[in-house]
Amino acid sequence: MHATNWFDDWNPEALYRDDVTGCDDCSETSPIPKSGIICGPILRLINMDFKEKTYEGSIMVVVRGEENFPKITYQLGPSLPSEDEDIEVNEAFFEGKLFHKDILKDDNIWFYRYEIKLPMSNYEQMVKYAVDGTMEPHYRFFVPSFTQNSNVISYSCNGFSLSVDTSKFKGSLWYDVLKKHRYVHYHAILGGGDQIYSDNIKLHAPNLKAWLETKDPIKKYNTQTTEETKEQIRQFYLEHYLNWYGYGHWYGSTPKSKTTQKCFVKSLACIPAINVWDDHDIIDGYGSYNDSFMKTENFLTVGRMAYRYYMLFQQHVSASKQDGDEYAYLKSKQWILGNEKGSSYIGERSHSIFSWLGPKMAMLGLDCRTERKLHEIFSERSYSLIWERVEREIKNLKGGHLLLMLGIPIAYPRLVWLEWLFTSKLLAPIKYLSKKGIFASGFVNEFNGDVELLDDLNDHWCARHHKKERNYLIMKLQDIGAKYGVRITILSGDVHLASVGRFRAKIHRHHLIMSEEKEKENTRIIEEPTKDVRLIFNIIASAIVNTPPPDAMATLLQKRCRLHHFDLETDEDAVPIFAKEVDGVHKRKESCFMNKRNWSDIIPIENLLNNPQLSKELGVKVGDIVIPGIITEQQKLQKLENDDQINSYPVTSGGLFTTIHVERDANQTNSQTVSYCLPIPELTVTCERLSHKGIKHLNIT
């Protein structure tokens, strides 16, 4: 094929500009057509095998009406032009199978999954594909070379809360994603939870709504789930996913709570996804209510139906035994299955994910929702299964990176005083009046009558119920990273603002007479982060769609953002990456927290330097020592002659470069973002055993 025919000018900025207009509104009725393809194509990444040099993934298409097996053909060729005018382009088709049949309003719904298994080359490749002969401009994705680590996106909170006034948000950050994808070539998009907001099940499942509004606790806790209720819940999740994943269509509880995210749907077809789920994929707070409420029949049904459709739409597998999809559901090699007993509420094993993203890059997505209870996120057995798999996979990854998807931030300010207040007996009279609807009706939730915000606090790793488990998890991550010389970076969302938490080797202070040994150790920690075996960043990117919290919340978090001693050798704090406003001029007091909509990407330094546009935009080179912060056309990262302060990091050949893309102005349809950047150095040393003396809540000697 001639190069000019292959390298077309795919220009998302021009093609999808009109798709952003009206993203603060939606049609009154569902956009799902009565027949034909009603959802998809949706791409999913399974794994990259750099020994066998194979790329594995899947495409899902959903059809309504008559059974009609769509055909997906593809072309595989180079992603970038070379000196050759004629290039080799291979053509074939993806093998598909019907893996699930469903019913929506008496119509048959057919789920088709197509296996992607492609050879990797010594250069990055582009795949263009067509569905039943139709090749849209965005029907394409990129396969890295077998020597290349992937460019990835991390995002969360992909939807609005029920009563948000969406008229305040004229832009779509998914438009920004597509514009950058044109020249960055993202190989994977990591969904950190809340890919869909399902809280409106309370509005659209009548029997569930009536049950939730029941004031009599005895009646509420003893209600049996009827077949009609089950069917309403099932129909809700199926239609809700088809509306959102097929058309970006959603409406909430007020006339001003509407959105149509068309660019999200296009992103599903051009960037393969790896997803874990969180509470809003089910219903707000699921797993963080008391055990007696979680075990009510109606709430068990909600969790189990949400799980079924999460698996179908986000993982492209069927959890139903009658579909015969057992291999994909339980035996596919990307899964790390949890405790054999399964979840107490959902009744299934947790599905954490391990995938390779490059010869020196892997990802671990922890399923922190399926097993979740008020007092436990994972069982001991599940942790042992996770660590066994991770150690087996990364034992030869020295100098590489492990990205850990952890939906809820783990390096985040403590709000214990709020937990104490919300559970205090002092509030009992107000809670009673609120439950009865006499006073402050929104003060308590309609589930179990707890204070409305308590489930959010109970979800957090720093909640009093989870502190021990949190510290155990961080300790294990530090131990494994140090043992194998792997830099671990945690990717989180959930909190509707951006931040960068940090664990690092302790800087010794407050010595009346600082010993020479301590001074040398401090110098090493500051000047050689590549040798800091305790260094773990927690990149928090949230929300790509939902509304950010008010300025007062960012101010509160900044005041609570103190230096903590995780153990005697590890400090925990946050990186002041947001020292300037998005205009690049005005200073921010809340330097560790940015309460604007955002998403993030993680680019290997080698890829960055080989990309002319990225290299020009970011303006860094190997050997630079930079202070994390804002990058604009007029302003690059501040560079230092020496690494003489704790918040500066080197740009290294084996490192990563993470950018949090923060929305400039939510009222503008151009959806422009501003970049806040941080280099993440690789780990060049190992340590067989770390000391964790002084760690709280664990008996470590």
Curated annotation (Swiss-Prot):
GO cellular component labels: membrane; mitochondrial outer membrane; mitochondrion; plasma membrane; prospore membrane
Cited Pfam families: PhoD_2
Disulfide bridge positions per record: none
Extra information: Present with 3230 molecules/cell in log phase SD medium.
The name this protein goes by in its record: Uncharacterized protein YGR266W
